[in-house]
């Protein structure tokens, strides 16, 4: 009977131990014995934000124009821009076969290297172009309030290489390829030769993943979550005297709206 009592005590202690482990905060041990498993974007995002912790979220589509003074560190130096971000992305895809590229933003249509090269080098009339003529980099990100960390986060999802209409024989802009942002970060953090160039102090140049995570670029908002999935430019009235300028101003107003949201969040 005494031995039976000892067995009962051991069983109770073991059960209590597992129960205590099960109640450990999932933020401390998210993959342990927790009673909840949190969904998380591990395909596109470089940030570990649990879906259940997204208290507020809106998607934003932006464009970086590498010709702008603030973005010259990404554009590269010299006339051919061989040390710029566009050429380094090309090398990562073609020379190293390290970045998977897609034809659509749903990432359902992978591109072969040959298809990527054709999209990259040939304009609509079949003429070859130069790397420096590719100066648009678009990307999609989510503006998220992470309630677990009480933090507002810009969570980039993918990058889109775009051929400008002028480069594309004035036949309209062309999507060259889509790249997962997580793949982009994982590649360039291990390739320090590809750098955001600090022209004032070369020793403080950064890898592309550091530059993007530090938001060392200037971009304009082209689209945000809306019922019609319309670009900001498409929402400008047709009778506007200067629709391009109005679209730019509307994008800027949206930027200020995000800043105001962040400011108001902590006001109370």
Residue ranges and their predicted role:
Residues 1-29:
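Bacterial Sec-dependent N-terminal signal peptides
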Residues 132-134, 154-156, 174-176:
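Extracytoplasmic
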């Amino acid at each position: 009977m005494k031995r039976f009592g000892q067995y009962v005590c051991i069983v109770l202690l073991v059960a209590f131990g597992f129960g205590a482990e099960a109640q450990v905060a999932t933020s401390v041990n998210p993959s342990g014995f927790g009673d909840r498993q949190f969904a998380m974007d591990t395909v596109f995002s470089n940030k570990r934000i649990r879906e259940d912790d997204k208290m507020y979220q809106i998607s934003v589509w932006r464009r970086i124009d590498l010709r702008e003074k603030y973005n010259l560190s990404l554009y590269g130096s010299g006339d051919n821009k061989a040390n710029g971000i566009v050429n380094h992305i090309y090398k990562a895809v073609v020379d190293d076969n390290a970045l998977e590229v897609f034809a659509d933003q749903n990432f359902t249509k992978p591109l072969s290297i040959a298809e990527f090269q054709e999209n990259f080098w040939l304009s609509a009339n079949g003429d070859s172009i130069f790397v420096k003529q590719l100066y648009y980099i678009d990307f999609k990100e989510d503006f998220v309030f992470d309630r677990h960390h009480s933090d507002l986060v810009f969570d980039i999802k993918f990058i889109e290489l775009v051929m400008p209409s002028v480069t594309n024989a004035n036949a309209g802009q062309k999507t060259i390829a889509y790249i997962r942002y997580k793949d982009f970060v994982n590649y360039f953090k291990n390739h320090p030769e590809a750098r955001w160039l600090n022209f004032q102090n070369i020793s403080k140049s950064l890898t592309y993943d550091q530059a993007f995570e530090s938001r060392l670029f200037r971009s304009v908002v082209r689209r945000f979550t809306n019922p019609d999935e319309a670009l900001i430019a498409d929402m400008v009235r047709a009778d506007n005297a200067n629709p391009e300028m109005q679209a730019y101003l509307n994008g800027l107003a949206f930027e200020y709206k995000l800043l105001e949201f962040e400011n108001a969040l902590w006001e109370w």
